[in-house]
Amino acid sequence: MKPSLLVFTVYLLWLKDCHCAPTWKDKTDMHGNLKGFSEAGDIDVDEEVKKALIGMKQMKIMMERREEEHTNLMKTLKKCKEEKQEALKLMNEVQEHLEEEESLCQVSLTDSWDECKSCLESNCMRFHTTCQPSWSSMKNTVEQFFRNIYQYLFPFDEDNEKDLPVGEKFIEEDAQVAQIENVFNQLTVDVRFLFNRSLNVFKQMQQEFDQTFQSYFMSDTDLMQPNFLPALSKEPRKKADPVQSWDIPSFFQLFYNFSLSIYHSISTTITKTLNAIEDLPKQDNDSNHGSLSSKTLPVQHRGPYGEFGQNLSECFQFHARCQKCQDYLWEDCPDVPELHTKVDEALELVNISHQQYAQVLQMTQHHLEDTTYLMEKMREEFGWVADLANQAPGAENIFDSTKMVPNIHEGNFSKQDETMIDLSILSSPNFTLKIPLEESAETSNFISYMLEKAVQHFKKHFKTW
């Protein structure tokens, strides 16, 4: 016997003793098991596919609910935008009217201002040495006094102009709304497409399902199946504060009884200030000229014209003789105080409408994020079944196992660690599973184990939308 033939014979005997290669009986048993696996697997795969189809049905129903909520939010957002634009339009109209009235007021007040200044000048003539060192500076002081009084009476807050919504703000908000709408619409299309693919799978396997399930899946009835819903993440998610109702009240009724009045508040302040000056202790003018120069207005009444208190306190105690100085604004410009009040009200209206719009916009954004999160979780759990629609119809079996051979680990010829099985669901391409030794064909849960691994394979390789 040649040495090479001897070595080959010894090698075959060694393989037989080690059971590293399957015997003819083993191969026959494996082939029989494959047929049994396919038949038993059809039953289990049927249930898994049914669960996934129910999940896809619930995904469709939930998306339809979310779509209706999104539509209501967008309608509310549109209404808020219209209210905000109307408030801004009103604000601009009132402000424009105020500017016109103030311009006319400046012209009509020229004579009144001259009368007031003349009255003060004549009554303060005897005190001009104490009021100011020179008469020219006295006139300048009186003119400055009137300018400050007018600014104090009608202070239009320049900062409010910065707070008003500008064109860039509207453009930014419109772009954000358009993006939300586009993302939600795309999500709706994706969910419908995924469900339609699942519907194709249902039609391929329709004869495998009972009549109750067929009726449910093809109907629009919202039949919740909590046992089949996905186990979504239990991590808490932040929710936007819900509004009381989608109905937005008319903003133009909020300030119907608005009682702010600049005229009354400022008029009261001026009256108190002048009365405080008038109540100063009367001094002997001939003997107390020096002391008069040291008189000052009370600190709390200096206001915007407190700088005139030191030397003009005695001059202004004659304001009763110059009532024109106190009433000229109300007589010649009666609409200006009211218009300032309306401007403040309109500005407040703009701010409230802007805040309301921002609140609804934030709710819409949160609603989109929550919907996307929920649909993604359901897609991850059930979407794999839609991938079966890519396979050609007409497969005889739902679940096929085409080949099962022992696997020998490299470098370890002493034992069989796992079995290699080629599987397919419907007409999907074959994929290979490695079955560990403890999950052998003789164990009762072998089919369940293979099916679980097959479903995991589909989920892992499921294409994202």
Curated annotation (Swiss-Prot):
Keyword entries, A-Z: Coiled coil, Disulfide bond, Glycoprotein, Secreted, Signal
Signal peptide (from-to): 1-20
UniProt cross-references to InterPro entries, sorted A to Z: Clusterin-like (IPR000753), Clusterin_C (IPR016015), Clusterin_N (IPR016014)
Source organism per UniProt: Canis lupus familiaris (Dog)
GO molecular function, one term: misfolded protein binding
Disulphide bond pairs: C105-C333, C116-C325, C119-C322, C124-C315
Record-linked Pfam families: Clusterin (PF01093)
Location relative to the cell: Secreted
Chief place of localization: secreted
Coiled coil feature spans: 62-106
Tissue-specific expression: Retina-specific (at protein level). In the light-adapted retina, expressed in the outer segment of cone photoreceptors. In the dark-adapted retina, strongly expressed in the outer plexiform layer in the region of contact between the cone pedicles and second order neurons with little or no expression in the cone photoreceptor outer segments.
Family to which the UniProt record says this protein belongs: Belongs to the clusterin family.
Name this polypeptide is given: Clusterin-like protein 1
Residues modified by glycosylation: N196, N257, N285, N311, N351, N412, N430
GO CC annotations, alphabetized: extracellular space; nucleus
Signal is among the record's keywords: yes
Domain of life, per lineage: Eukaryota
